[in-house]
Amino acid sequence: MPDRGARRGARRVRLNALQGINDMPKQSIIPAGTGKPLAPYVPGSMADGVVYVSGTLPFDKDNNVVHVGDAAAQTRHVLETIKGVVEAAGGSMHDVTFNMIMLTDWANYAKVNEVYAEYFPGEKPARYCIQCGLVKPDALIEIASIAHVGQ
């Protein structure tokens, strides 16, 4: 019959190893002037020098859609918001390595890309772009980003 104490000890070792995973330092990134989000999340989160920027919509601090009907202006607003999160974490837009872009209408793709190119003039980050519905009907774009800003 196996020794129950040995099994319990082995389980404790496994649990202690797993607990170490949760001890990794994580920091919330909330730039000054940020409004209350619509759901339980923060604008950005940083761990091990990597900044994860939440899906960013063209909202003012009161969660109202700005620049209704203007995809270019909404894109600029979203990218400025992302820039604020990345800079609050100590980085720059040059540190952005990946963007996830969500559009409500492919007809806005060229306008979005024109503004996007202004924020990423040199080496471009990887990205994908999909068409989908967004949380508010007047929002035409949402972008989530990943940036590597170092330790």
Curated annotation (Swiss-Prot):
CDD domains per record: YjgF_YER057c_UK114_family
Catalytic activity entry: (Z)-3-aminoacrylate + H2O + H(+) = 3-oxopropanoate + NH4(+)
Xref: SUPFAM superfamilies: YjgF-like (SSF55298)
Keywords: Hydrolase
Gene Ontology annotations of biological process type: nitrogen utilization; uracil catabolic process
Pfam family, one: Ribonuc_L-PSP
A cellular-component GO term for this protein: cytosol
InterPro entries referenced in this protein's UniProt entry, alphabetically: RutC, RutC-like_sf, YjgF/YER057c/UK114
Superkingdom, taxonomy of origin: Bacteria
Enzyme Commission number: 3.5.-.-
Coiled coil location: none
Molecular function as annotated in GO: deaminase activity
Biological role stated in the UniProt entry: Involved in pyrimidine catabolism. Catalyzes the deamination of 3-aminoacrylate to malonic semialdehyde, a reaction that can also occur spontaneously. RutC may facilitate the reaction and modulate the metabolic fitness, rather than catalyzing essential functions.
Family stated for the protein in its record: Belongs to the RutC family.
Protein name: 3-aminoacrylate deaminase RutC
Organism listed in the record: Stutzerimonas stutzeri (strain A1501)
Lineage: Bacteria, Pseudomonadati, Pseudomonadota, Gammaproteobacteria, Pseudomonadales
Gene name for this UniProt entry: rutC
